[in-house]
């Protein structure tokens, strides 16, 4: 949330989505494509994740990332990474090497140091651009989190989310992006979702799984959207926080929804039509077959 559409971001998202479609048509898995998308988003430096991540109050960048495969429900979340500029580099390498769901900080990065992914004893500093964003956002809900939800040719789904957090963070703060059921979730029987917004609200109301179940359980796509809108409004009413989501449910298809002013999202429709917006007023897109990348 909060990321505006610009010519640079539009060109980047268009190019990245077209590459993702190529991988889909070649039979790549939903999980691997979600990894590719979020890795590109991290490395672009355009968003509050990876190279563009902002600092916490002590000037240290701590990055969180999470992924889940709907086929086998395997999830991995890494949090408070300080020596890994692109958390996806570490997550992809660790994913098949551990049965754990959550790994944090120095212990997670110790493996990355041994395999030359993370830099020992060196903090990853924020870019000047990221610091300027942080200064503007002091005391406001987080924005610029990146994520992808994918349904592949076999019908499997996956979700990946990565973030640098939000402005005005106490050192050590952990948000929703590394927590399954909150900032991301994927289940072949339901669908896949990636969240953005104020992590404290997303965590306390388990927004990821709640929205996905509401969308999948509705009778039709229009009802599904209305159900999700009510849940987001409940989040704002009960916690004063806002959030946004990209999701695809197996029954009712894709949805882009947000309460904040902006949420930059790119979608690749049939016949290579690309739809990129930073505002998604209440229209249903459930009849459009597309790949979603946030």
Task: Indicate residue ranges for each PLM-predicted region.
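Alpha/propeptide regions of enzymes that mature by internal proteolysis
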Residues: 1-294
